Structures are given as C-alpha cells and as structure tokens.
Swiss-Prot record:
Its EC number is 1.14.13.235. This is Indole-3-acetate monooxygenase. Belongs to the HpaH/HsaA monooxygenase family. The gene is iacA. It comes from Pseudomonas putida. GO terms for molecular function: acyl-CoA dehydrogenase activity; flavin adenine dinucleotide binding; monooxygenase activity.
C-alpha cells in the first residue's frame, strides 16, 4: 500500500479494493435509509470502519505508524466516500488533521500517535475564546460552533486567545480529550446533516501549553507532506466532498433515466434530446473541474517531492481550483435534480440529498467569492488579501 500512497496521481490503494467497496456500499445503504441525517452524526461503527481502513492514519508519518499518503491519494479516498454519502465524506475529511497537529511540540505529537495512529481529531476554531493563563497552562471556558465530526472524535481542538494581562496573544488551538468537552446538538440544517457539526462547550479545563499551537504555525514534522500548502489542503479536502456528491447525482440520474416513465406520456428521460444535451454539459463541467482540481494538486506535489518550495502562482491555482470544484459540483447536482423532474424533489430522493449537501459545501468560508477576488488579483500581478496563501 505504501508505494501506491506516495504516488502523486489518484487511483491509490486507499480508494479501491473489495473491502473499501463493501464499506462504501454499507455507508450508501445506511445513508439512503436516513440513518445519519436522522441522528445528525455518523454512527460510531462507521468511524471505527474508517479507522480500520486507514482514513485517519493516511497522512500520519510512518514513524508514528501512519501511511504518509500523498494529497491526491487522500482526496480521492474522500471523494469516493462522499460519493456514498456527503456527510460521511465530510467527517472522513478530518483525517487531514495531521496538517494542524504538526504544529504541536514533537513530544506531544508522539504522545497522540503513540496512543494510536488512528486518532480522530475534530474541533471548533471560531470564535477564539479568551483563555486565562494559570499555573499549568491555560484555563479554558467557551463555546465553539461548527465542530464537524466531534461526536466520533477521540480528541478535540478549540480556538483560544490567551489573555496576558489586558492583551490577547495570537489565537491558538488547545487540544484536549473529547471527554473534557460537552457537545450541544445544535446542528439542524438543510444539508450535510450527518456531519454532526454541533457546538463544543468547555468549562474550566486547564490545558498545558505543550497541548496548544498556533493554527498555521510552522510544522514540527519534516516529511514531504508537511511542505505542501496547508491552508490550500484544508480547503481541498472539503471541496472534494462536493465532487463526490456531484458524481453521485449524475450516476443516480443515469440509473433512473431509461426506466422512468413520465406521467405525461413523454419519452423516457434517456430518449429526450434536450436531456441528452444537458447531461452531457453537466458531465463536461464536472469532469473539467475535477481535472483542474487534481492537476493543481499534482503540480504542487511535484515541487514538494523535488524539495522545492511551492511557488505562489501554483498555490493560487490550488485555492482557485478548490473553490471552482465546489461551485461546479453544486451546479451539477442541481442540474441532475432539474432533469429528474418531480422525482428529485422528495425528501427520500438521493438527488434531493445530493443537491442540499452540495449546496452546503459552497457555504463554507473557504468557498466564498473572495477566492476569485484573490485569484484574479494574482493573475493581474497584485497581492492577495492576507490569509489567502
């Protein structure tokens, strides 16, 4: 598996094989029965199955028992899971957590993965809450929203702004056992219901400084993956969820197109010329966006493997291709629903779920129009806004 994982191109061992296909079939069946949406989180046995497959150790360094996969290999795995269910793919995407945790002291990282390279991390960053500096570290109190996957996490991270007198230092993330945080089930949305992106509440917990880090800080790991643009990767693992959802929508439409009889007596969907035109346009749009997405990843990864810094113009394409993929995916899912007619409007319709899930992906702050503004500025030779690269 290792040699395949290190390849820059997709089609890795993590995204294929009989055991993985069986896992996806199970996730798909349970999603269609409404299990994840109804309970508003991914079931613990599914998280355990993700662990067994290697979702959470995929990007962990080999020295800690991980697989050290490439960004493309990881993204393709998340895309395949998202094809089975968008919420499951979103939760699985937090297997990218080594990107964040790499900024912890090396001894802390070793302790986390010494317990298990399959450790599941989740958390809420915003808004950073003021933390009192006390003996032994930081005393933390607060509430954090959008803590996706926290119901199945082993450890969680919360955003803090340490208070030094009347001054607040740089925002940090504090890492603590899941048992020291309370989850308030506030996640009630039109899509991605199964992500369980509830509120995290922490009350009077002291966290040692060695269990905190500045988000986006210099990594303390030197494996190739940790030279890949971290903010770009954080966006990519989410936008690739949209690509998987959109592919599921087109596959669902194709499966129903020949057998569906119109109540008006019109020809089957597959026999309608305008439907043929529209589905071809949707396929072209999705395949083009996907190609741009993976091409950008591979180009950046080539620089990493060569030992060179990733140029800013390449990083710009990572950000642009990521937002573009999410936007196109949502449009494609909606096109598939439109072509399905009234069939696609029922709550139990997989197409309806695809549309809602894909739209929620586009609502993430990473996928806003500001990406296009920054990318366009760079194409004109101007500087992007702070925090873009």
């Amino acid at each position: 598996m290792d040699s395949l994982c290190l390849r820059a191109a997709p089609a890795s061992a993590l995204a294929s094989g009989p055991a993985f296909e069986a896992l996806l079939d199970g996730v798909r069946d349970r999603a269609r029965l409404g299990e994840f949406d109804r309970q508003r989180h991914i079931s613990r046995d599914v998280i355990d199955a993700f662990k067994a497959h290697g979702v959470y150790r995929a990007l962990v360094p080999k020295r800690f028992g991980g697989l050290e996969c490439s960004p493309a290999a990881f993204c393709e795995m998340i895309e395949r899971i998202s094809h089975a269910d968008g919420s499951a793919g979103w939760v699985a995407s937090f297997g990218m957590s080594p990107v964040y945790l790499a900024a912890l002291p090396l001894e802390t990282i070793a302790e986390i993965y010494g317990n298990s390279p399959d450790t599941v991390f989740a958390g809420g960053i915003f808004p950073p809450q003021a933390a009192e500096i006390v003996s032994g570290g930081f005393k933390i109190n607060g509430r954090w929203k959008y803590s996706s996957g926290s119901m199945g996490a082993d450890i969680v991270g919360v955003g803090i702004a340490p208070r030094n007198g009347d001054k607040l230092d740089l925002p940090r993330l504090a890492v603590l056992p899941r048992s020291q945080a309370r989850i308030e089930e506030t996640w009630d949305t039109v899509g991605l219901l199964g992500t369980g992106s509830h509120d995290l509440v922490v009350e009077d917990v002291v966290v040692g400084e060695q269990w905190t880090f500045v988000r986006g800080g210099k990594p303390n790991l030197d494996e190739p993956f940790f030279r890949y643009p971290s903010l770009s990767f954080a966006t990519q693992v989410l936008s690739v969820v949209g690509l998987g959802i959109a592919r599921a929508a087109l596959d669902e439409l194709s499966g129903m197109a020949s057998g569906r009889i119109s109540v008006t007596g019109a020809p089957a969907l597959a026999d309608r010329p305008l439907a043929q035109v529209d589905v071809a346009k949707a396929e072209a749009a999705l395949r083009s966006a996907r190609a741009f997405f993976y091409e950008s990843i591979e180009r950046a990864w080539e620089h990493v493997l060569a030992g060179d810094p990733v140029p800013v113009d390449v990083t710009n394409l990572l950000r642009l291709s990521s937002t573009h993929a999410a936007r196109v995916a949502a449009e494609v899912a909606r096109s598939a629903q439109m072509l399905s007619g009234m069939t696609g409007i029922y709550n139990e319709s997989p197409l309806a779920r695809c549309v809602n899930d894909a739209q929620v992906v586009t609502q993430h702050a990473f996928m806003g129009d500001v990406t296009y503004q920054n990318a366009g500025a760079m194409f004109f030779g101007k500087q992007p806004l702070p925090g873009y690269l």
